[in-house]
């Protein structure tokens, strides 16, 4: 799919996965969705989307993963059509080739980050000149995690995850070992349903109470590296429901907790992916290499990752 030379009708987007450094379920909103308080972080485990501009109204998608639909139910297709409808130019089209590296159904926002990359990439490829906040607002129509994935980095996320408060600091030094059992996926709606069944009686019911909890999250210095040694400050509420009912998550968390020098160990999102934080990427990579046989025996896919300050990277150069 790569043209003979770089040109303005071709673009590559690297779409970064995310982890949840914090996830609290506060209660039920008036629209029936859960009210959440989260801290999300982009990591360098990435999908790659190659895009070639068309001018014949055609939007094509192909992928290296046969599990990926190339129809209208795919978030990439939804994002492309949403953007085209927004600018009211039905002649716009694109060929997209997806290299899928982020595991599916893993709590890593793999589909959402692909949609974010599509919006950012086509905004540039189609020369639409929409601002980031316009793309974030537009993306809320098709997914709660997509607004975060557009700008990425480390952000506090409220509402369904679409209300963003970006955190700014000089360096994101932490590394992580990320694991997932490739034999399972966890349905996000099922995870929230299960949590509501078990803990719904403790839900907050008033927006004033929601705001008190939001302010509590805001008051934490999320750039403080030592914060991630204090397990009382960090939580993933969904882990309380998913861990007991999912042996693969239990296995993952136990193995990660046994690694030397690991700091916070947690499930990401609704799972089943889990991670252990380390002082930096080099330490995480060293530990992964030293324990790779243990992960293989446990049937876990494993990655050493660094944290990213953005959600998507665009370029039109190629090798």
UniProtKB/Swiss-Prot annotation:
GO terms for molecular function: 4-(cytidine 5'-diphospho)-2-C-methyl-D-erythritol kinase activity; ATP binding. Pathway: Isoprenoid biosynthesis; isopentenyl diphosphate biosynthesis via DXP pathway; isopentenyl diphosphate from 1-deoxy-D-xylulose 5-phosphate: step 3/6. The active site is at residues 18, 145. GO terms for biological process: isopentenyl diphosphate biosynthetic process, methylerythritol 4-phosphate pathway; terpenoid biosynthetic process. Its EC number is 2.7.1.148. ATP binds at residues 103-113. Keywords: ATP-binding, Isoprene biosynthesis, Kinase, Nucleotide-binding, Transferase. It comes from the Bacteria. Pfam families: GHMP_kinases_C, GHMP_kinases_N. Transmembrane segments: none annotated. Gene3D superfamilies: 3.30.230.10, GHMP kinase, C-terminal domain (3.30.70.890). It catalyses: 4-CDP-2-C-methyl-D-erythritol + ATP = 4-CDP-2-C-methyl-D-erythritol 2-phosphate + ADP + H(+). Belongs to the GHMP kinase family. IspE subfamily. NCBIfam families: ispE (TIGR00154), PRK14608.1 (NF011202). Catalyzes the phosphorylation of the position 2 hydroxy group of 4-diphosphocytidyl-2C-methyl-D-erythritol. This is 4-diphosphocytidyl-2-C-methyl-D-erythritol kinase. The gene is ispE.
């Amino acid at each position: 799919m790569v043209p003979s030379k770089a040109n303005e009708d071709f673009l590559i987007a690297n779409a970064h996965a995310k982890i949840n450094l914090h996830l609290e379920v506060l209660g039920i909103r008036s629209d029936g969705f859960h009210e959440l308080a989260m801290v999300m972080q982009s990591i360098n485990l990435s999908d790659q989307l190659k895009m070639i501009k068309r001018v014949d109204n055609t939007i094509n998608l192909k992928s290296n993963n046969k599990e990926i639909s190339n129809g209208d139910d795919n978030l990439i297709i939804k994002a492309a059509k949403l953007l085209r409808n927004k600018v009211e130019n039905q002649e716009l089209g694109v060929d997209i080739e997806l290299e899928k590296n982020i595991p599916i159904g893993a709590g890593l926002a793999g589909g959402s980050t692909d949609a974010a990359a599509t919006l950012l990439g086509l905004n540039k490829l189609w020369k639409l000149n929409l601002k980031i906040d316009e793309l974030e607002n537009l993306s809320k129509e098709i997914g709660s995690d997509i607004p975060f994935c557009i700008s990425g980095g480390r952000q506090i996320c409220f509402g369904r995850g679409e209300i963003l408060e970006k955190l700014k600091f000089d360096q994101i030094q932490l590394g992580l070992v990320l694991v997932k059992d490739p034999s399972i996926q966890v349905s996000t709606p099922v995870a929230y349903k299960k949590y509501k069944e078990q803990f719904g009686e403790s839900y907050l019911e008033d927006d004033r109470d929601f705001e008190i909890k939001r302010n509590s999250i805001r008051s934490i210095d999320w750039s403080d590296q030592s914060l991630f040694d204090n397990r009382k400050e960090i939580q993933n509420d969904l882990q309380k429901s998913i861990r007991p009912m999912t042996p693969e998550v239990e296995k993952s968390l136990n193995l990660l907790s046994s690694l030397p020098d690991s700091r916070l160990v947690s499930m990401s999102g609704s799972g089943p992916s889990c991670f252990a934080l380390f002082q930096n990427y080099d330490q995480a990579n060293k530990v992964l290499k030293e324990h790779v046989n243990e992960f293989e025996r446990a049937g876990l896919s494993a990655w050493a990752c660094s944290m990213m300050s953005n959600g998507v990277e665009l370029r039109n150069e190629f090798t």
